[in-house]
Regions:
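C-terminal motif of bacterial Sec signal peptides marking the signal peptidase cleavage site
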Residues: 7-9
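Long, well-structured alpha-helical subdomains associated
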Residues: 396-492
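Fold-level signature of zinc-dependent metallopeptidase catalytic domains
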Residues: 20-32, 37-49, 130-377, 381-385, ...
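Sec-dependent N-terminal signal peptides
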Residues: 1-4
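N-terminal accessory alpha/beta regions
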Residues: 62-146
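Short, hydrophobic/amphipathic alpha-helical patches that form generic packing surfaces
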Residues: 52-62, 87-94, 137, 166-169, ...
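Extended, compositionally biased alpha-helical segments that mediate assembly or anchoring
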Residues: 477-534
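N-terminal mature-domain "stem" immediately C-terminal to a signal peptide or N-terminal signal-anchor/transmembrane
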Residues: 14-98
C-alpha cells in the first residue's frame, strides 16, 4: 500500500498524462490476496485447478460482452488503452453509460453479444423457440438467416468440457464432502445446462474453507431483455473468525426484533434467519463480476426454486471492502468529515454497517397489519427503496442494541455513525438514481432535519451529534417500519418525493470530491503469482 502511494507521488503531473492513462488511474490497482496458511495441503492443490476454471469463465464472458478479444487488443497500440479495454471487457466505458472510448466503435448493443446485432424486437417476438428466453441459450442466425437458439453447453462446448474436467479434478482433492459434491454437480451442470442440483448443493456447504462461485449466473449484461446469464467466477477463502461472529449475531435476531422502537403489532412476526451468511476474502474475480466496478457482497443463488427450498447465501467479501475503504472512503472522509471526528472512521464500523444491513433485511415486518397483503405488494415500485432504507437504519439500530447487550464494545457506536455518514458520500458521489441511492438521500435529509449532523459552511465539513443521531435513528426506524406495516404507499411516496434526491448544496460537495482525483473504484492484480502459488 505504502509503495503504491510512493509510486503515485513520483508520477508525472496530471496535465502531462495520456488521457486514457488518467481513466485507468481512476481505478486504483490492488493485489487481491489473503493468508492461505490455514488451508490443508490438498486445499492448496485445488487452487490452481479452480483458477484455471475461472480463467475459462473469463474467456467466455469476453465473447458474450464483446466478441473477439484478441482482435480488439491488437487494433490498439498504446498500453493505457489496452488496460482500459481489459478493465471494461470491451471498447465501452461501463461506468460512463457504456460510452465508446475507441474511435470508430459504435454504441454497445443493449443485448451485448447474446443476440444478433441486427435482430429487431418484433423478430424476436415472432421467433417461436421455447428456449429463446432461457438463461442458458444464445440467439443466433442459421445459414438461411433465420433465428435459432444455441444452448451454452453447445456454444461453449470446448470451454465447458475443460472446466468440467478441472472441477472434477478439484473435487477429487476436496476433503469436505459437500464441497466435493458441489464441484462434481457443477461440472455436470456446465455440460447439461441444468444448474438446479448444483445450486441446491452449494446451499449445503457450511464448513468449507474454499468457496467457488462459477458458471453463467447474473443477467445484467443482457440489458436488452435481462434473459441471458453471463459467465463469471469468484474464488473465495472463508474468514472463519468473522463468519462465527456473524452466526452469533444472526442467532440474536429474535431478541433484536423485540428491541425495535415500534409498538408490538409492527414486530409480531418472527424474524427470518434461514439464509446463511458468511465472510470471505476473494482471491480471484473472473468474467462478469470483474467488469467495471467490483462487487463487495454476493447474494446467491438467483433461482426462486432454491429460495423456496433452502433460502440463499449472502457472502461478504471482506478484503475487497477493505480496499474500497482504504482507497475511496478514507480519502472522501478526509475531505468531508470534521477533522476531529475522523478518528471515528474505522474499517470495523464500515464492515459492520454493511453486514448488519444484510442481517437487518430479516428484521421488521413482511406482511401489513391491516390486511393490505404483503409489504412488497402494498409498496409496489417503492418497495426496494423503502426496504433498503429499513435495512440501513435497522442495521444502525442493531449496533446500538448489541452494544447494550454487551455483544459489541462500548464506545464503538460513534464509529458506526460517522462511518455511515462517510459511506453515504461514497455511495452517492455518482448519483442517487438506484433504490439504495434514494434510500441514502432519505436518511441524509432526515438526519439533517433532526440535527443528527451539521455542516460547517466555512470548511465544508460535516459533524455528527451523537445524542441527536441516536434519537434520529430510532425515529426514522419507527417511521419506516410504520410505513411498511401500514402498507402506506402514499406516505412512502411523499417521503421520497421530499427527500429521495440530491439537493444542490450536497451536489456541490460531491463535485468537490469528484474533482479531487479520488479513485472511482478498484482493479485487481490477481492470480497464482500474486498468491505465491507459482
Amino acid at each position: 500500500m505504502a509503495l503504491a502511494g510512493w509510486l503515485s507521488a513520483c508520477q508525472p503531473q496530471t496535465e502531462n498524462k495520456n488521457p486514457m492513462q488518467m481513466k485507468v488511474d481512476r481505478f486504483v490497482e490492488v493485489e487481491l490476496t489473503t493468508d492461505l496458511g490455514h488451508l490443508s495441503a490438498k486445499e492448496k492443490q485445488m487452487l490452481p485447478l479452480l483458477l484455471e476454471t475461472a480463467q475459462l469463465m473469463d474467456d467466455i464472458f469476453w465473447t458474450q460482452a464483446y466478441g473477439d478479444k484478441e482482435a480488439l487488443l491488437a487494433s490498439v497500440d498504446d498500453e493505457a488503452t489496452r488496460a482500459f479495454i481489459h478493465l471494461n471487457y470491451g471498447p465501452w466505458e461501463r461506468l460512463n453509460n457504456n460510452t465508446p472510448f475507441i474511435p470508430g466503435v459504435g454504441p454497445k448493443p443493449a443485448g451485448a453479444n447474446f443476440y444478433p446485432a441486427d435482430m429487431s424486437d418484433e423478430e424476436f417476438e415472432a421467433f417461436k423457440a421455447i428456449d429463446k428466453t432461457s438463461l442458458y441459450t444464445l440467439v443466433r442466425r442459421n445459414e438461411a438467416g433465420e433465428l435459432q437458439t444455441v444452448p451454452y453447453s453447445v456454444a461453449y462446448r470446448e470451454e465447458h468440457q475443460k472446466a468440467a474436467e478441472l472441477l472434477r479434478k478439484a473435487a477429487m482433492l476436496a476433503e469436505y464432502e459437500p464441497l466435493k459434491n458441489y464441484l462434481n454437480l457443477r461440472a455436470e451442470a456446465l455440460l447439461s445446462d441444468n444448474y438446479l442440483a448444483s445450486d441446491l448443493a452449494w446451499m449445503d456447504m457450511r464448513e468449507n474453507k474454499i468457496d467457488f462461485v462459477v458458471g453463467p449466473i447474473e443477467n445484467y449484461e443482457d440489458a436488452r431483455y435481462n434473459y441471458k446469464a453471463a459467465h463469471e467466477a469468484y474464488l473465495l477463502i472463508k474468514d472463519l473468525e468473522w463468519s462465527q461472529r456473524l452466526d452469533r449475531f444472526t442467532a440474536l435476531l429474535p431478541q433484536l426484533q423485540q428491541g425495535l422502537p415500534v409498538s408490538e403489532a409492527y414486530k409480531a412476526e418472527q424474524p427470518g434467519s434461514d439464509s446463511d451468511m458468511g465472510v470471505y476474502d476473494a482471491i480471484f474475480y473472473a468474467g462478469d463480476c470483474n467488469a467495471g466496478s467490483k462487487t463487495i457482497a454476493i447474494n446467491l443463488p438467483n433461482d426462486p426454486v432454491v429460495h423456496l427450498e433452502k433460502g440463499s447465501r449472502k457472502l461478504q467479501l471482506k478484503n475487497a471492502m477493505r480496499y474500497k475503504f482504504d482507497h475511496i472512503l478514507i480519502p472522501i472522509a478526509e475531505k468531508l468529515i470534521a477533522s476531529d471526528q475522523q478518528t471515528h472512521i474505522s474499517f470495523d464500523a464500515f464492515f459492520e454497517n454493511t453486514m448488519f444491513h444484510e442481517v437487518a433485511h430479516g428484521l421488521g415486518i413482511k406482511n401489513t397489519i391491516n390486511n393490505k397483503g404483503t409489504v412488497r405488494d402494498a409498496h409496489r415500485d417503492l418497495y426496494s427503496t423503502i426496504e433498503e432504507n429499513k435495512a440501513d437504519i435497522l442495521g444502525l439500530q442493531m449496533v446500538r442494541q448489541l452494544v447494550e447487550m454487551g455483544e459489541l464494545e462500548e464506545g464503538a457506536l460513534m464509529d458506526n455513525y460517522v462511518t455511515f455518514m462517510a459511506g453515504i458520500f461514497r455511495s452517492v458521489r455518482f448519483g442517487a438514481s438506484s433504490a439504495h441511492g434514494k434510500s441514502n438521500m432519505l436518511s441524509f435529509y432526515f438526519f439533517e432535519e433532526e440535527g443528527a449532523f451539521s455542516r460547517d459552511a466555512e470548511t465544508g465539513r460535516y459533524r455528527v451529534d451523537f445524542e441527536k443521531m441516536q434519537a434520529a435513528v430510532d425515529k426514522l426506524a419507527r417511521r419506516i417500519l410504520t410505513l411498511q406495516g401500514d402498507g402506506d404507499y402514499d406516505g412512502a411516496q411523499a417521503l421520497l418525493a421530499e427527500k429521495g434526491f440530491i439537493r444542490e448544496a450536497l451536489q456541490a460537495d460531491l463535485d468537490r470530491i469528484n474533482a479531487s482525483g479520488i479513485p472511482v473504484d478498484i482493479r485487481f492484480k490477481q492470480g497464482a503469482g500474486v498468491l505465491g502459488l507459482k
